[in-house]
Amino acid sequence: MKRFSFCLGMLLISLLMEAKICMPAYFSDYMVLQQKSVVQFHGRAASNREISLSVGWKKQPYTVVSDAAGCWRLDVPTPKAGGPYEISISDGEPLTLHHVMVGEVWLYAGEDHTLLSLPGVSDPEVRVLSVKPSIALAPQQDLPEGTEGWKDLSAEMTTQIPATAYYFACQLHRTLKVPVGLVSCVYPHTPIEAWNSFEALEQVPGYEEHTEMLSSLGFQPDKIEAAYARQREAWFQDLYTHDMGWCNNHQVWAEPKYQDENWKTMGLPGAWETQGLPNFDGVVWFRKTIDIPRAWHRKQLALDLGPIADEDIVFYNGKEIGRGQGDGRRLYTVPRNLVRRGKAVITIRVTNYEGEGGVLGMPDDMQLSVKGKKPLSLAGEWKYLSGLSLSGIAPVPISPSCDPNFPSGLYNALIHPLIGFPMQGIVWHQGISNLENVEEYADLQLSMIADWRDKWQRPDLPFLLVQQGSYGMAAEPADDSSLPFLREAQAAALMMNHTALVVTTDLSLQQATLQQKAFDKGFRLVQASLKQAYGKKRLPEFPSYLNHVVEGNMIRICWKEVGKSFAPVEPLRGFSVAGTDRVFYPATAIIDKKEVIVHSPEVPHPVAVRYNWADTTPGNLFSTSGLPAVPFRTDHW
């Protein structure tokens, strides 16, 4: 990857006025600096000017001379926790940072966006830097425009950061009794590949084409945008190529004489997911034959179809009369030269990329009319046939400048500017947006952790990972679901040192309020941080699978990190077993001291066992410390 020099990167920090010191946004009033670390104060000033930096915990100032481009840097050791301090930077014109604390600084990153309004909150020793969500094609040197700097924790700030982050910071402060700084760096509904740097993606199989493209284009935004435009155009052309209703650039299924007797029927308006096409994304053609009254002959018609998700092409007797996209109502005009009395065929080609698809809205939205006459309702039964399923083609290319899913886009904008700012550790709360490519998740997560540690030059930088909790309503074993596999991939990070997994499968929506869930996750994160970052080694952990032994028609499961014993409970839920046919059945489970024995009458010869292998997890196995067991499986089917 092309390396940008330090001074060239500094040019991107902000507009610079002569003789005025400019620094990255995380150097501000109310900031918290990591105690007993070395902070790299840096920025720009006038060229060849002596820079003086005074800190409240040291009598003698630090000095350096800016280079020809005005770039300067000073490495300043920080003391143990304390404050408030003032920090003054001057090149002849002073800039003073007020109310600076020294304590513990943590980065909270990912896609968690559970925001709660918590009135009455105020804690001057907990400070928050909420990073403005943004994306970038190349690594940035300063935080996104709109990032306002550090703030005291207040009721207003709780609506700007995830509730789990808030409870983590507050409980950490109360536990350690030192100032805490939280850098909140979240972007909802984003996948892990967007948080990986270019260098990290180079280490992950399957991203060779992406990284080679960026490298060959020199990371130049205009060239990357042009390449994306070509890819997107080619992708949409492929939709027509593979659409069975579109042959040799001709809309075969829109022709009025096309024989549609074997097509199924669907009531419109209405989402097709509830009418025979569940979980379908792709192209569906709709046809309806109507009678045009004699009085309408050779008159211009108004065609109202209501809202359509997501895109549509509309034909009247085989002739295209309009196209639409987005959520708006579809209003089209049928030219008078196409209108003849008698039979006419209206055809709608609908393309849906995600979510509900079809002709939506209300029955009164669908009508054909001529000025001064009673409209003809088009609601009711339509013939339909799918022309293309998107499950059979590559995903649509991701916009590099507009889509936060673009690989490396969030790392470039949100994480890279923070590199070098000392952190005690990182909380990673992300995952649900990777259900479509869960098989890549473990590699992406491991590469990201190693890369961030390398860039911070902290091979022991603690990573606390929040495992995805319950999702949806179904509590049955989920053989085809991606969510259990995501949890398994998240747990793979435990093979790296100084990592911790915070299990949340017991915190379902049915069992706790959002506020209580956030509080519990925050508490568990603090416990994990005490062990990984602060040397408290004797704290309880989440029980996890160690091994198992088949004993006749039963399986005996051995665990680690149980503590004294499991908490007694009847009935014990969440286990399933399978034989060589690989069909899993719910299992009866009993606790035997620090082990669990499972069996099922449907499986006389069990070979595999799973625990909490479902979207919404029913398991109730806890240690006596109140920590839930980690979901697992013994098979690799």
What are the language-model segments listed below?
Residues 25-29, 280-293, 330-332, 412:
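Short beta-strands within extracellular/lumenal beta-sheet-rich domains
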Residues 34-41, 278-281, 302, 520, ...:
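Surface beta-strand/loop "capping" patches
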